Amino acid sequence: MASTTTWGGTDRGYDMSLWYDSRPLKIGWFAILFAVGAEVVFQRVFGYSHGLDSMTPEFENVWMNLWRFNVITNIINASAILGWLWTTRDRNLANLDPKTELKRYFYWMMWLACYVFGVYWAGSYTLEQDASWHQVIIRDTSFTASHIIAFYFTFPLYITMGVASYLYAMTRLPQFSKAVSFPLVGAIVGPMMILPNVGLNEWGHAFWFVDELFAAPLHWGFVTLGWCGLFGGTGGVAAQIVARMSNLCDVVWNNESKDCLHVIPY
């Protein structure tokens, strides 16, 4: 039974840091918030003053330089994160201790939380403001002040976090290293395929359906692929995590046989 400490807190009877450390999640969330916030502030300052006519030198200097910056920084960011995850992978997963595996699930859910946070900024915030931008501004290029932030910054950002989440599971969790999880693939690849769908969307707006109607067939792919991520993540992946963590808790705390860990709940 938990006891009260001299500071008015509760003594859980165990060291929380052995199981969960929220610092990586806080670092990831605040890094994403700062990066996207900086881009949004930049857009608010220079969007209408330098971002309406793509033929002007000001547009080239301000917005196309931001486009180049976004492309380069996303390549560096993806290379650094994915490279670190791969080089530090666990090469002896067959002998992974159940307690260590259980702790890794907490860290993996932090990766997934950062991925979902990135999906929000790309699929909700920047896309909604892109739709409102098209309602009042006539585009003369596909590299609009709205697209440069949405498609060339927030989209690669959440794709990197999604691939990183998949790579973490594949290289550190036995459940996902032994076989391919269809729900996890759907949760990652579905939203990822929104980016090539953007190319189809831009082509269609240029040569087929000029009006920016929200219910236009060109936009159906955004909804369908977004729902793939939602159903794959909230349904299948969540069920797999709960089932595996339940078995691990039985082994760690209830002294159950490790035989239950050989059953992979796909």
Predicted regions, residues:
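C-terminal transmembrane-bundle signature of multipass membrane proteins
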Residues: 181-266
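Membrane-proximal helix-loop-helix units in multi-pass membrane proteins
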Residues: 114-179
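Internal transmembrane alpha-helix with an interfacial aromatic "cap," most often the third helix
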Residues: 72-133, 165
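Alpha-helical transmembrane segments and their helix-start/interface "positive-inside/aromatic belt" motifs
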Residues: 9-33, 98-113, 172-186, 240-243
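Juxtamembrane "helix-exit" motif on the non-cytosolic side of transmembrane helices
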Residues: 43-49, 122-138, 197-212
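Alpha-helical transmembrane segments of multi-pass membrane proteins
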Residues: 31-49
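Hydrophobic cores of alpha-helical transmembrane segments in multi-pass inner/ER membrane proteins
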Residues: 2-4, 70-86, 152-165, 222-242
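Perimembrane loop-to-helix junctions flanking transmembrane segments
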Residues: 47-66
